[in-house]
Amino acid sequence: MRWIYISPHLDDAILSAGGLIYDQARAGTRVETWTLMCGFPPEADPSPFAQVLHFQWGFASAEETVRLRRAEDARAASRVGAQAVHFDDFPDCIYRRGADGEPLYP
């Protein structure tokens, strides 16, 4: 048997169900966390809001932020016995832009 936890954003599955995931993995069940909104942003110029967050978090760029957050998520999943799977299709909300090219979260 295999359990898959769908996580909209990095760390959501572990924060929401980490104890259950741990118990399942410890019982020998294969457990995966699938994070959907963790793709690398296509823009080299993130919104002012994203830039403020990068500064607060101590990261130099959007790419570094996503790379390090993915690594953190994978370590957290590993700690509870799960395997982290990251999808590249959609970036997190702070990197998304509307049809007009403007940031959704300026």
Descriptions of predicted regions:
Residues M1-P106:
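Active-site beta-strand->loop->alpha-helix modules in alpha/beta enzyme cores, enriched
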